[in-house]
């Protein structure tokens, strides 16, 4: 199963190497990295082109004018070939078994599940962020998880690509940000 790791980036030349190194070290190699450069002016695009040449996984890079994260996500979804789609911001990085875990968990999910949620590490604190997730599969949505289960904190969401294609983020004139919850709830 192919997983799409998607990164929207804007002037993050200083954080991209750590992210790329975490992708190079993945134990499960059946993934692609799709990057939309949202109009960077700091040579991020040149760095991404160098990464593409040395990567041992497929890399797709698209350069667009600065339109904000959600427009970049919509572009990334259009380019995605994976069954699952994970947004990995340019200042994030993955545990070396992250994609392997995604692939493993996805094989055990009921067909009607639209995705998976994992906890993230707070880099500044060097600790796992937010409250623990339920130990068993839980059929829910982000609002219920937050209000009913009391689980807050930043999470790593992995959504079926077909759902992302069906429900793109809205794009508003003069607005560059739409919270993920607008679509995912």
Regions found by a protein language model. Name each.
Residues 12-25:
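Short, well-formed alpha-helical segments that are part of the catalytic scaffolds
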Residues 22, 37-47, 89:
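A conserved acidic beta->alpha catalytic loop
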Residues 30-39, 60-64:
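Short beta-strand/loop segment that forms part of the nucleotide-sugar
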Residues 122, 129-185:
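Conserved nucleotide-sugar donor-binding catalytic segment
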């Amino acid at each position: 199963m192919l997983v799409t790791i998607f990164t929207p980036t804007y002037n993050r030349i200083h954080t991209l190497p750590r992210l790329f190194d975490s992708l190079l070290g993945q134990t499960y190699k059946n993934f692609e990295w799709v990057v939309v450069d949202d109009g960077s002016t700091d040579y991020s695009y040149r760095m991404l082109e160098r990464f593409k040449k040395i990567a041992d996984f497929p890399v797709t890079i698209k350069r667009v004018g600065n339109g904000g994260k959600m427009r970049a996500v919509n572009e990334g979804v259009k380019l995605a070939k994976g069954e699952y789609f994970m947004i990995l911001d340019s200042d994030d990085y993955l545990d070396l078994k992250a994609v392997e875990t995604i692939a493993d968990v996805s094989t055990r999910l009921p067909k009607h599940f639209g995705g998976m949620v994992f906890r993230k590490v707070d880099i500044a604190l060097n600790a796992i962020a937010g409250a623990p997730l339920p130990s068993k599969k839980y059929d829910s949505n982000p609002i219920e998880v937050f209000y009913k289960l009391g689980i807050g904190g930043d999470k790593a969401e992995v959504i079926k690509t077909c759902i992302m294609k069906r429900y793109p983020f809205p794009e508003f004139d003069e607005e560059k940000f739409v919270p993920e919850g607008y679509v995912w709830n």
